[in-house]
């Protein structure tokens, strides 16, 4: 199967698994854990609330489906990288697709202006600390919820009035960090706590040599920069000081495989660190 069709199939699978009107994952896990039929929306899965309460000790007070799903998500990220983001999440895929509608000269390369990782993890830290001041952000700027609303409107004609925070979120997600961002995944890079939490455990797994990861064969790499140009997360760079060789940043790599597909000499692969040539 051609690579682009594989990616599309993965995101369609994610849509069927997690979003209305199907939500097969929530239905199956909900029935397994509680023997009840869960509402088929992204709310019953919510990965953001358990992450928000991971520091204050209230993580297990919420829906068992939500808590178990979050634990599964982080374990998968530790072992295999942020595969949910890179291969299943249709909310991220939508803005990546939208960005292709705008010529490159009109798009912002955020890496050219700032380091992504400090902002990414800083937002995650703030997100997890908010409960200590009796606040909650999980539902305030949720692009998953917005995607669910778009799907409900398209399939059922159902919509709700949006709060000012959700209107701002939609503008940032779809326009600023979507249409006019290189790769279309600016929201994923800077504002998504689910992606940042996965990246944190993935980066730890990479440093321990445990996680499967995208890796560069230094003997094959010719420093052409095609991977850096293609990467939707701007996680791939070519460092002149490193003999013009590509480097992949585990702090925001989502193991989507775009870099490997774009490499003309097949210098990038996915596997355990000890498999690196």
Segments from the language model and where they lie:
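Non-ligating segments of multi-cofactor redox enzymes
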Residues: 1-242, 246, 251-254, 258-277
